[in-house]
């Protein structure tokens, strides 16, 4: 068997927020790719992990050897010398590729950058198991909604004026100081911009450090307001969102730090957002492809029963305040492929990964891809077809995952009209 292209078995996580039973794409993919997986219809299936992360590594489908071990035996062939030199790793991929199926809101969270990741890992390896940063990209496979980054300053000022419950938590002095002193049109990086960020940090800190009793009282009042006076809110979808998330996490601080301070983002299938390290975000519902730097570090803020590290969270965030449209990514044309179907590239402004989506709208269509200068992982998400490389022709069905070595030309062939694949890869430049 060639060691340049081979099928992988990917593990799955059953976090509470995952879609239930067969409604989950994660469950469907896991069961279709491994007939021994019996879907439990009352259990959540949240994440499919594809990569070398030690928490849930992928395995060669035939030999059952871990991808991590396969790479460590021949890193120059599996990663490429330039990738080894750049990321200083000889047994792991610099990215982690996932499918997420989201039924309930995930915790509002942010991820440390590289410098802070090393510090937190050294201080508290239990809660911060990695020393790396974790920028992420999410591509919607179905309709998706989430929180991403702080709202523009004027929107937050309007919330403080219109929603007494938020003002009660933030406090009169901090609220007034924010409303009167923000400069929404400040240039990025200017002293005025830095002052804006300090004002926003003060508001967020007051919310995150409010007592549980205060949050509980004000949350119940906020939910009643959303039912009885929906016009008090500056966005028409906010009252419904508050009520829905309150059913999932009653009286939670996330109703304030999420619904009222963060952008509420909706993506149609094919749209994507990039989430920088140290930017607050949370996924609310939908199915997504997610790619990230290889880390599992999370600093949580709300909508979670898990450990909340409020002190580090408040101090580490960037406090950028862009509208949600600025965080969306435009797919790019991918010039190194030809033939039937369509390939688009999602290329975030970081060095660890990019993701290529390929779709076919006709049976028996074929598309050729030149080799890329680093390792890849490819998953089929819809339809049936084949992946061909290095003299092999392997069946590709929903949930089937493959490793592709550097510099290897690949062909995809559609057996069905709606054949779709996603390919995460890294290159040195």
From Swiss-Prot:
Q: What is its EC number?
A: 5.3.1.8
Residues modified to N-acetylserine: 2
Q: What induces it?
A: By D-mannose.
User: For this UniProt entry, what is the primary localization, expressed as one broad class?
Assistant: cytoplasm
Which GO cellular component terms, listed alphabetically, does the Swiss-Prot or TrEMBL entry include?
A: cytoplasm; cytosol; nucleus
* Group of enzyme by EC: isomerase
**Catalytic site residues?**
300
Localization annotation: Cytoplasm
Q: How is the cofactor bound?
A: Binds 1 zinc ion per subunit.
Q: Which reaction does it catalyse?
A: D-mannose 6-phosphate = D-fructose 6-phosphate
Q: Does the record bear Zinc in its keywords?
A: yes
Q: Name one GO biological process term.
A: protein glycosylation
Q: Which cofactor does it need?
A: Zn(2+)
**Which InterPro entries does the annotation name?**
Man6P_Isoase-1, Mannose-6-P_Isomerase, Pmannose_isomerase-type1_CS, PMI_typeI_C, PMI_typeI_cat, PMI_typeI_hel, RmlC-like_jellyroll, RmlC_Cupin_sf
Sorted keywords for this record are:
Acetylation, Cytoplasm, Isomerase, Metal-binding, Phosphoprotein, Zinc
Report the GO molecular function annotations: mannose-6-phosphate isomerase activity; zinc ion binding
Q: What does this protein's UniProt record list under function?
A: Involved in the synthesis of the GDP-mannose and dolichol-phosphate-mannose required for a number of critical mannosyl transfer reactions.
Q: Could you share any additional remarks the record makes about this protein?
A: Present with 5220 molecules/cell in log phase SD medium.
> Which family would the database say this protein is a member of?
Belongs to the mannose-6-phosphate isomerase type 1 family.
User: Subunit info?
Assistant: Monomer.
| Protein name as annotated | Mannose-6-phosphate isomerase
């Amino acid at each position: 068997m060639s060691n340049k292209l081979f099928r992988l078995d990917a593990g799955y996580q059953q976090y509470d927020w995952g879609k239930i039973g067969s409604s989950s794409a994660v469950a469907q993919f896991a069961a279709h790719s491994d007939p021994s997986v019996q879907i439990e219809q009352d259990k959540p299936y949240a994440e499919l992990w594809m990569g070398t992360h030690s928490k849930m590594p992928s395995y060669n489908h035939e030999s059952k050897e871990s991808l991590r071990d396969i790479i460590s035996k021949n890193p120059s062939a599996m990663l490429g010398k330039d990738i080894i030199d750049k990321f200083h790793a000889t047994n792991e991929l610099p990215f982690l590729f996932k499918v997420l199926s989201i039924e309930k809101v995930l915790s509002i969270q942010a991820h440390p950058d590289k410098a802070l990741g090393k510090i937190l890992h050294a201080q508290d390896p239990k809660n911060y198991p990695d020393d790396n940063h974790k920028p992420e990209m999410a591509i919607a496979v179905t309709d998706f909604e989430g929180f991403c980054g702080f709202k523009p300053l004027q929107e937050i000022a309007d919330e403080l004026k219109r929603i007494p419950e938020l003002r009660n938590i933030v406090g009169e002095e901090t609220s007034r100081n924010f409303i009167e002193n923000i400069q929404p049109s400040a240039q990025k990086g200017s002293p005025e911009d830095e002052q804006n960020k300090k004002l926003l940090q003060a508001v967020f800190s007051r919310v995150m450090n409010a007592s549980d009793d205060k949050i509980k009282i004000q949350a119940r009042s906020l939910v009643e307001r959303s039912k009885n006076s929906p016009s008090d809110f500056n966005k028409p979808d906010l009252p419904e969102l508050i009520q829905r998330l309150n059913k999932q996490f009653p009286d939670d601080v996330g109703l304030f730090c999420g619904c009222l301070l963060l952008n509420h983002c909706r993506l149609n299938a094919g749209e994507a957002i990039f989430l920088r390290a140290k930017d607050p975000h949370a996924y609310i519902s939908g199915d997504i492809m997610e790619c990230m730097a290889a880390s599992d570090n999370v600093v949580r803020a709300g909508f979670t029963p898990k450990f909340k590290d409020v002190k580090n969270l408040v101090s580490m965030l960037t406090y950028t305040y862009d509208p949600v449209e600025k965080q969306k990514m435009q797919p790019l044309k991918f010039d190194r492929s030809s033939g039937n179907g369509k390939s688009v590239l999602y290329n975030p402004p970081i060095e660890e990964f990019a993701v290529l989506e390929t779709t076919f709208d006709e049976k028996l269509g074929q598309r050729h891809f030149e080799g890329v200068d680093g390792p890849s992982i490819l998953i089929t998400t819809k339809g049936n077809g084949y992946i061909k490389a290095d003299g092999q022709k392997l069946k590709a069905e929903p949930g089937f995952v493959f490793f592709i070595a550097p510099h290897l030309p690949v062909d995809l062939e559609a057996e069905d009209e709606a054949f779709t694949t996603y390919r995460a890869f890294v290159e040195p430049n």
